[in-house]
């Protein structure tokens, strides 16, 4: 089984915690997780992947972080067709509209969003959110 990448941006550590839980799920299912902060990642590593995960908290008016994550996602959109992508993020306010938009964006690029929607957590992820992240990792490992 090849590496399954989990690439994220985290400002407070909440999304990083979720990335760790996704990796735990991948490993529990027998896969190998390669967890990277988006600032040290290249979208090129995902081109040959069948499945991977992306995580980013809601920023500003419910959008992706603009400095590193948005440009990364724009690159991924160019080759997302046929891939299974797990999405996860945390938020402070709102109702997760950014996640619905992000999932729709990936689907419009031809990807399948694992589980049909992303995993979200309000601020610090609770055990339910972390368990959902682990399940997401297991789903990605099965692709």
Give the residues covered by each predicted segment:
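FMN-binding flavodoxin-like domain, especially the glycine-rich phosphate-binding loop
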Residues: 3-4, 14-17, 23-38, 45-143
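Short polar catalytic/cofactor-binding loops
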Residues: 9-13
């Amino acid at each position: 089984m090849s590496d399954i990448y989990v690439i994220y941006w985290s400002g407070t550590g909440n999304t990083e915690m979720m990335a760790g839980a996704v990796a735990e799920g991948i490993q529990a299912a027998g896969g190998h997780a390669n967890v990277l902060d988006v600032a040290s990642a290249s979208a090129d590593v995902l081109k040959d992947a069948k499945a991977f995960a992306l995580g980013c908290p809601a920023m500003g008016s419910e959008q992706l972080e603009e400095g590193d994550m948005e440009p990364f996602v724009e690159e991924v959109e160019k080759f997302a067709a046929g891939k299974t992508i797990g999405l996860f993020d945390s938020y402070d306010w709102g109702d997760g509209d950014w996640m619905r938009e992000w999932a729709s964006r990936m689907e419009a690029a031809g990807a399948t969003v694992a589980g049909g929607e992303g995993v979200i957590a309000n601020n610090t992820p609770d055990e339910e959110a972390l368990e959902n992240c682990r399940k997401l990792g297991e789903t990605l490992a099965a692709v």
